């Protein structure tokens, strides 16, 4: 699959067979891959099938600028599924062809707002979302922080054609002593300080959709009440005698593994079963590099419409090999930082990227094991209000910053006390990660 670059005829994918395939600027017939790239030699590289190894191999045909596999220059190497190949300024990804999978360039599902990307993974998620949108069943959106779960919830609501509003709520940001009142409402005098009645978020979403983001943060007693609402389609505000019927579609989202939470008694199995009637998975950005180039172009047009900010092949390759712990939000932040550094536009090389993106992937022969630089992994990244990093993300940041809580707080745009609260929550000791410890 072509991720980045200029392929003759605008082709976006090539099916490999048993016959050798050459790549270059002048390779003849259509079974070969012709690249309109001045950095590519006339006959640059060849991919061939080995009957002995039952694997594809690639070899450099004596090119001027080399062949790179997962960021490392090679002469001859086995190709594995998921590997990135760079020749000049053109980057490919080797993928297995799945039966029934949408082809690159296939029409995207009709959802508003439209999602930016062309990976099969994203397209499958959008197709599923479009199919289940007209129903009234609960939907659970799974995916790590920054993948656009809130945007998908909004798209499902619009496609449902429900007449009411979409009411979003971040469960992690609700005060623990007010969650029930916020969701279900209360009557005047129901508790100390209840000087007036409150309708609650469920009634605010009447005939519409209630989006419960970070649902894994809800306490067990609230989970039980939520389950009853889903089953009875009615609510009882705090202090009320009678129940009120509601017509609300619930869309929930989480970056947690709720199956794991159920197994450890932190999430109700019956609520989990109810929510998983319809599940849409949004994969992390690191697993769908096909979406990087269109997302980059989208953010450049959005944030710097008068700037022409382009990427070199080496810079794109480094981005495709990056782990993207904060996903699409991190990419947007990278574009913003690049536009600030180059307001007039131009081409970004690999040296213009954050240090963590410049090191080669570990494990490929020839990669430098000691290439991890000091400093933050990306430009400063601000979390949205109420957003909470997952334990894995927090541990990764503690490792990157060698246990320096002050630097982590600056990186996330949060107070140090909040970082310490998260560390205690996830039982992470920053001292264990400081230089010279243990």
Report the location of each language-model feature.
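Intrinsically disordered, low-complexity acidic Ser/Thr-rich regulatory segments
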Residues: 1-36, 48, 52-53
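Bacterial C-terminal helix-turn-helix
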Residues: 11, 148, 333, 369-438
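C-terminal boundary/linker segments immediately following FHA domains
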Residues: 23, 48-57, 64, 68-118
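Dynamic helix-loop-helix/coil hinge segments at AAA+ ATPase domain boundaries and subdomain interfaces
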Residues: 103-127, 177, 322, 380-386
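Conserved RecA-like P-loop NTPase ATPase core
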Residues: 125, 147, 169, 183, ...
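Conserved post-Walker A coupling segment in P-loop NTPases
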Residues: 128-193, 203-219, 284-289, 334, ...
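Conserved AAA+/SF3 P-loop NTPase catalytic/coupling segment centered on the Walker-B
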Residues: 139, 155, 176-181, 202-233, ...
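Nucleotide-binding/hydrolysis machinery
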Residues: 157-164, 239-249, 256-368, 401-402
């Amino acid at each position: 699959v072509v991720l980045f670059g200029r392929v003759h005829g605008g082709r976006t994918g090539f099916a490999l067979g048993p016959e050798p395939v050459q790549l270059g600027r002048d390779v003849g017939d259509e079974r070969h891959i012709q690249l309109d790239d001045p950095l590519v030699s006339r006959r640059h590289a060849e991919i061939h099938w080995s009957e002995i190894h039952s694997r594809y191999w690639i070899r450099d045909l004596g090119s001027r600028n080399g062949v790179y596999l997962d960021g490392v220059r090679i002469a001859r190497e086995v190709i594995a599924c998921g590997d990135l190949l760079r020749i000049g300024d053109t980057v490919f990804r080797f993928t297995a062809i799945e039966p029934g999978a949408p082809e690159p360039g296939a029409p995207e599902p009709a959802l508003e707002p439209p999602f930016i990307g062309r990976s099969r993974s994203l397209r499958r998620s959008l197709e599923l979302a479009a199919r289940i949108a007209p129903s009234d069943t609960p939907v659970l959106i799974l995916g790590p922080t920054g993948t656009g779960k809130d945007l998908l919830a909004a798209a499902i609501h619009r496609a449902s054609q429900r007449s009411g509003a979409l009411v979003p709520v971040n469960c992690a940001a609700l005060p623990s002593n007010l969650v029930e009142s916020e969701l279900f409402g209360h009557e005047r005098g129901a508790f100390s300080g209840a000087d007036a009645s409150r309708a609650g978020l469920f009634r605010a979403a009447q005939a519409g959709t209630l989006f419960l983001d970070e649902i894994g943060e809800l306490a067990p007693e609230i989970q039980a009440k939520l389950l009853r609402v889903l089953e009875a389609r009615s609510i009882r505000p705090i202090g009320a005698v009678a129940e009120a019927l509601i017509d609300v579609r619930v869309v929930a989202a989480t970056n947690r593994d709720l199956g794991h939470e159920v197994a450890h008694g932190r999430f109700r199995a019956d609520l989990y079963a109810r929510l998983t009637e319809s599940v849409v998975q949004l994969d992390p950005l690191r697993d769908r590099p096909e979406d990087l180039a269109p997302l980059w172009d989208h953010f450049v047009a959005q944030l710097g419409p008068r700037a022409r900010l382009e990427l070199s092949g080496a810079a794109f390759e480094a981005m495709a090999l990056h782990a993207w712990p904060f996903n699409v939000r991190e990419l947007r932040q990278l574009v913003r930082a690049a536009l600030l550094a180059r307001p007039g536009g131009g081409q970004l090389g690999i040296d213009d990227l954050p240090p963590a993106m410049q090191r080669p992937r570990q494990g490929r022969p020839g990669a430098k094991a000691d290439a991890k630089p000091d400093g933050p992994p990306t430009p400063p990244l601000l979390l949205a209000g109420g957003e909470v990093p997952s334990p894995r993300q927090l541990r990764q940041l503690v490792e990157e910053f060698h246990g320096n809580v002050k630097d982590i707080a600056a990186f996330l745009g949060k107070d140090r006390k909040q970082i310490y609260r998260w560390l205690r929550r996830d039982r992470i000791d920053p001292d264990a990660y400081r230089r010279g410890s243990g």
